[in-house]
């Protein structure tokens, strides 16, 4: 009988979990997942923050697709305050978040390939991610912690640079 620690991985890598394995030879007979390595005390910080500050606090919780973290409290505040979001703002939210979803899935595939021994796909996935991040930076003004969603809409309309980058990216992605 032997115990083996898998992890914990660093909180800014693609795994934030520790698993304690109980082995009998090479056979896993039990495991104990240990969660909580991503906890940053945001709940406590948000207790004394106004609504707009909460949005900026949740961005770093999932750095690969932080707009989704902004969306949850914004929707909750909008429901509590009975705020109607313009349709265009909803479309902009969906568009920007879906771009991050593509980026996130691309990174997942790259990391998975790296874990299986392939180096090239992770490099390709970072190239793809960087293009999407630069596109969103032209829209939001920031590369990682966007702080773009607002109660009642977004922090700015679609601009020419973003639309141009989006068109180029979509043309290339379609081939």
Where are these regions (language model features)?
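Active-site bordering "gate/hinge" segments
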Residues: 1-18, 22-175
């Amino acid at each position: 009988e032997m115990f083996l620690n898998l992890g914990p991985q660093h909180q800014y890598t693609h795994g934030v979990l520790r698993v304690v394995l109980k082995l009998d030879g090479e056979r896993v007979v039990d495991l104990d997942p240990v969660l909580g390595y991503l906890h940053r005390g945001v709940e406590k910080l948000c207790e004394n923050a106004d609504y707009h500050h909460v949005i900026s606090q949740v961005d770093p919780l999932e750095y690969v697709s932080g707009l989704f973290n902004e969306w949850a409290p914004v929707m909750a505040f909008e429901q509590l305050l009975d705020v109607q979001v313009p349709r265009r703002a909803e479309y902009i939210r969906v568009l920007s978040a879906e771009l991050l979803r593509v980026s996130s899935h691309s990174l997942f595939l790259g990391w998975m390939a790296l874990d299986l021994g392939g180096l090239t796909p992770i490099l390709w996935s970072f190239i793809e991610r960087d293009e999407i991040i630069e596109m969103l930076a032209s829209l939001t003004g920031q590369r990682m912690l966007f702080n773009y969603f607002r109660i009642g809409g977004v922090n700015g309309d679609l601009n020419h640079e973003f639309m141009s980058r989006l068109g180029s990216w979509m043309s290339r992605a379609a081939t």
